[in-house]
């Protein structure tokens, strides 16, 4: 089955979900219909593993906009396969979990599952895209669907603010990424990603190479919540927990990492890229791990822990990026080891973090709180979640016999080997190891502290008063399955390592198939070495800090108020107030004022152009022949126009304005343009009648006395606008050096297959204009239909 058919199948499921929104009886089954999408995609991608392992990559290319090299290019290699499996398999767990989390009585289920399926469709589109512009479209679709999901409970102020904040930051990064893609097109002449990576040696010597890297980093850092763009992720926790488990831990936040991995053969050619990604990742890891200890909300803790873990993966992606420069060197195996560790921990993090979010969601759903100051001794009430969250948290902390231990060991090993790499000095290595170890200590601390406070403290019935707590099996099933995978991966890591991660490494290395020999064999025991010593130190220090320190009392007062997010909110509120004041000053419900402002800005732009190039010179002016009729019509038009300034009765003004329109109709007839005359006549008649009918239903309020200052402004704007129009006519008559667009239409008319030049212009040459005009009519019709339908429902409700 083609990759396109898979995407079409997901779109069909989305359409079915939308249809269910019309039938309340069917709406409650929307989740199970939506569940088909990740199941189908999971089966599809699992079947493709043997083919990808044999280097039989699946690709599809459908021409779209050939002149701009924008095509529907899709490609399934090892990297896209790994990410697609994570998106699809985690999707099954999350979609099923959501069917138990949401209520068909309180929630609009079709709307939620449509948004969630749209997000899954967009993420799969990102990882399969082999065209930069296509990737950008899917990239922004994830931002849009994330916005819709975060704001799903739109009556909640936190949901609204979180959705807006995440949308603004991620779209800003997306626009920067688009600029980077355009730079790549300028440098290579193609938008095809495979072809771009094949020109890496040419691109690195181009003047736009470094600016392009910065654009890519902005896109990746904003999407993957790297410092200082991390602030949107904690606010996004206002979304329903299934959204947090899927988007904000396992998939969307990994899109930035995917971007850098996909372009590693190109970006890694710059040492600057290696430095920036490595140190930004480590700073983010340290910042996230410390800030997590400040949180009282369990989802807040997990949000900052996600930021920290993403920083850890990003640091490994940065260090491993140097492989692009040293593929044939003896140290190539170190880079491959680091990249393998990044991919391994990316997979591990998706599993244990999704399980943690699901556990928090069950606690919130059943206990009614996520506050660790209220939740205590929950192991008695939630034994299954105690097991799930404890194992998942310890895996995140890097405790032995769990999958997180293996990837954390690889991370520490990678840090200690940076001294052997040409990009890092001994001092850099010491700083990297120090920051990585300190961040890991705090990671262990918040992971252990979280489960200790929620499950292993004494149950206090005075603080937690809710009764009749239960822990449904179906609700717990997805998190239990993910929990089982945590120790399973520890004992059989190479099933995933050799079967999936090595395939992804081939793509990250730029198609170097010899990387199979360089890829590490994951072992549970490497003997007593420096990474193991560091792990022991981390566990001992982290245990002491988690057990002996009451972190709820440490971050209090002014220390707690220090926050990058609060600084963003302060700036945002300031600009919001500033914009509101300006808006109220400008938008005063006066149409003539809006027209004056619009024309004024237009005149400023034209005036600036005249200042730069000089006023148009009048020479060889061609004046059309005119007779007495044209002179009379012109005098009538000018006379009526001047009289409108002094007339105070609105109805008289409307009638005279209509007369001007009819005079223009006579002008068209005199100029032998009957089609334009007929159009003008119909439009002018309808608008005049509508005006008169509207005024007949409005109170007879006389027009206010003229304000001399305002009238002078109006007359001045009108005269200046008239002069500009006349000057533009002069300019167009003197552009003899340029070919006329009308000549092009006449010569190319036969190519369209049309028999009428007007039809050819509307249907071919100006097809987009016609399309958008049609869309305007459709949207207007939908608006009218909605209003009428609303009135019908309202009347029916009143009768009932």
Curated annotation (Swiss-Prot):
Keywords carried by this UniProt record: Antiport, Cell membrane, Ion transport, Membrane, Transmembrane, Transmembrane helix, Transport
Compartment(s) of residence: Cell membrane
Domain of life: Bacteria
Primary role: Expression of the mnh2 operon in E.coli is not able to catalyze Na(+)Li(+)/H(+) antiport. It does however confer higher growth rates than the control strain at up to pH 9.5. The operon may encode an NADH-ubiquinone oxidoreductase.
InterPro entries: CPA3_Na-H_Antiporter_A (IPR050616), MrpA_C/MbhD (IPR025383), MrpA_C/MbhE (IPR046806), ND/Mrp_TM (IPR001750), Proton_antipo_N (IPR001516)
GO-annotated cellular components: plasma membrane
Protein family per UniProt: Belongs to the CPA3 antiporters (TC 2.A.63) subunit A family.
Annotated transmembrane regions: 1-21, 33-53, 78-98, 118-138, 167-187, 207-227, 241-261, 273-293, 300-320, 331-351, 387-407, 424-444, 472-492, 527-547, 595-615, 627-647, 651-671, 676-696, 712-732, 768-788
Record flagged with keyword Lyase: no
Topology of this chain in the membrane: Multi-pass membrane protein
Subunit structure: May form a heterooligomeric complex that consists of seven subunits: mnhA2, mnhB2, mnhC2, mnhD2, mnhE2, mnhF2 and mnhG2.
GO biological process: monoatomic ion transport
MF annotations from Gene Ontology: antiporter activity
The keyword Cell membrane belongs to this UniProt entry's keyword annotation: yes
Name recorded for this polypeptide: Putative antiporter subunit mnhA2
